[in-house]
Regions:
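A conserved alpha-helical element in kinase catalytic cores
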Residues: 39-78, 90-105
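Active-site activation/catalytic loop segments of kinase-like enzymes and analogous catalytic loops
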Residues: 206-230, 245-262
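A cross-family kinase active-site recognition segment
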Residues: 91-150, 173
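Juxta-kinase regulatory segment immediately upstream of eukaryotic protein kinase catalytic domains
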Residues: 1-15
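Residues forming the ATP-binding cleft of Hanks-type serine/threonine protein kinase domains
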Residues: 86
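Active-site acidic catalytic loop and adjacent metal/ATP-binding pocket
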Residues: 20-33, 37-38, 68, 160-210
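ATP/Mg2+ or Mg2+-diphosphate-binding catalytic cores
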Residues: 128-144, 151, 250-285
Length: 285
């Protein structure tokens, strides 16, 4: 879908080019003399308003953000909005330790903000690890996808075992970005200046932030974070189970919809890191 001409005319925008997006789609436009970004939202109204509320909440915390300019406005059942253009260059992938330090600094900036409500439609990674529905779904698909189900079940049981003894009741949730990856950051002159993509922003356990920031391979992100804000043994014990839970959540949703894994999830589950401790044992093929 391309931007509706009537909307472009109403908001007096000139198209520059397509910017892409995973679920939400974006176009760079000219708003008067300034660059801006037009967004087509993937989600429903509640999700749109939630994410805009997050942007409003963190608006005064010192980074350039895709701040709302106009909208949101529904056109033929799809939501659109206009946002500030976030200037700067993406952070190099190989600069993981600095990215980890920036993540810790971001959490420090957000520490005293009011905690937002739960994200609409977000069940959370804990559900994958704690609810019997995950086991029932694996049982139901074992005959059709034996290799995948065996892989998923092995990692699910290992993650659950690793969480025994963790005192979840004493762990306080915080606002996390949820996708602190190089392509969602903007830097100028070696300094983090901008942050984008709040599709996964939500109140959650601190260690859920590392699911996509670490991904089982970027160990220096964790080390860089700890350089600024020390992580406890309990924090580190959650690192791998929560990463696996993120992967398994997507895998289980695909199983439920009848979507066959193309190998991506299986490859990610097999990745091992020194930070995994005892969970670094290889999967027994």
């Amino acid at each position: 879908m391309t931007p509706p001409p009537a909307l472009l005319n109403a908001w007096k925008l000139q198209m520059i080019g397509e910017l892409g997006g995973r679920l939400n789609c974006h176009w760079q436009v000219r708003d008067g003399r300034e660059r801006a970004v037009l967004r087509r939202w993937y989600g429903l109204e509640a999700e749109v308003k939630y994410e805009l509320g997050i942007l409003n909440l963190i608006g005064g915390t010192g980074l350039h953000l895709p701040t709302l300019r106009r909208g949101p406005q529904a056109v033929d059942g799809t939501w659109w909005s206009l946002h500030d253009f976030v200037a700067g260059a993406p952070v190099p992938r190989e600069d993981a330790r600095r990215r980890g330090r920036w993540l810790a600094e971001l959490h420090a900036r957000w520490h005293d903000l009011p905690l937002p409500p739960a994200r609409p439609g977000w069940s959370g990674v804990w559900a994958v690890l704690s609810e019997p529905a995950a086991d029932a779904l694996l049982d139901a698909h074992e005959t059709a996808s034996p290799a995948d189900v065996r892989l998923y079940r092995w990692h699910l049981h290992r993650a659950r075992t690793a969480l025994i003894g963790i005192h979840f009741a004493t762990r306080s949730p915080m606002l996390i970005h949820g996708d602190f990856t190089p392509w969602n950051l903007r830097m100028q002159r070696g300094v983090l200046t901008g942050l984008m993509d709040f599709e996964f922003a939500r109140p959650a356990d601190l260690m859920e932030e590392f699911a996509l920031a670490w991904r089982g391979i970027h160990d220096d992100v964790v080390r860089g974070y700890a350089d600024h804000t020390p992580l406890t043994d309990e924090d580190l014990a959650l690192l791998t189970p929560l990463w696996w839970a993120h992967l398994l959540g997507g895998a289980l949703r695909d199983l439920e919809r009848g979507i066959q894994d193309d190998g991506w999830t299986a490859r990610r589950l097999r990745v091992r890191s020194p930070l995994m401790g005892e969970l670094a044992a290889p999967y027994p093929d």
